[in-house]
Design a protein with these regions (language model features):
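Core catalytic region of metal-dependent phosphoesterases/phosphodiesterases
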Residues: 1-79
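Short, flexible, glycine/charge-rich loop motifs used to bind or transfer phosphoryl groups or to couple energy/partner
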Residues: 33-34, 59-60, 73-74, 119, ...
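Secondary-structure boundary elements
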Residues: 79, 182-184
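A broad structural signal for short, well-ordered beta-strand segments within beta-sheet-rich domains
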Residues: 67-68, 107, 183
């Protein structure tokens, strides 16, 4: 446990939910439950691009008291902070993952609804409810955060003609979320 106790641990995506059966994740939970209880830990996970969104925004959500997945735009309250959680990102390796699914159709490996979503209505509702967000946890980031260049992306774009524009749109989505939060 690295000396961590009495803590909320937020995992900012890429947990791997969807690559294995639901029983696999339940077994992990049962394996770590004793430690979560003994050290008073709660693990909350938001979706990354290497996660099936159904585990976060759909019918496969994990809702254990000390181990759970959260939907986009969930507000966590901890240590006097209001923490906004927004998952999703574009997979730069999606063509390779799609090719693997052709060879192994019984295995999930890519989800088309992976991108982050700018939900202005959800953000407006926070303002209407007088919820002041002081912490934001996301899987990807606005354009002013690292990585600020797309160096290294060009080799992936050789195999995915839409990747450059999709990652540009991803950053714009995150910029829009950031601007909205600053405005409120």
């Amino acid at each position: 446990t690295y000396g961590i106790h009495d803590a909320l641990i937020i995992v900012a995506g890429d947990c791997g939910f969807g690559f294995e059966s639901p029983d696999y994740y339940e077994d992990i939970y049962l394996t770590i439950l004793r430690h979560l209880q003994a050290y008073n830990l709660c693990i909350v996970m938001l979706r990354g691009n290497h996660d099936n969104p159904a585990y976060f925004n759909g019918d496969k959500r994990i809702t254990h008291e000390r181990w759970q997945t959260v939907a986009d735009y969930t507000i966590l309250q901890a240590c006097s902070h209001n923490i906004l959680c927004i998952g999703g990102a574009i997979s730069i390796d999606r063509t390779r993952r799609l090719q693997r699914m052709v060879l192994h159709p019984e295995q999930e490996g890519y989800w088309t609804d992976e991108a982050p979503i700018y939900d202005s209505e959800a953000l407006d509702a926070l303002k209407e409810q007088c919820v002041l967000i002081d912490t934001v946890v996301t899987h990807t980031a606005p354009s002013f955060c690292e990585l600020q260049t797309k160096r290294g992306l060009t080799s992936w774009c050789m195999h995915d003609s839409a990747l450059w524009s999709d990652t540009t749109q991803e950053r714009q989505t995150m910029d829009d979320i950031h601007a909205h939060l600053l405005r409120d």
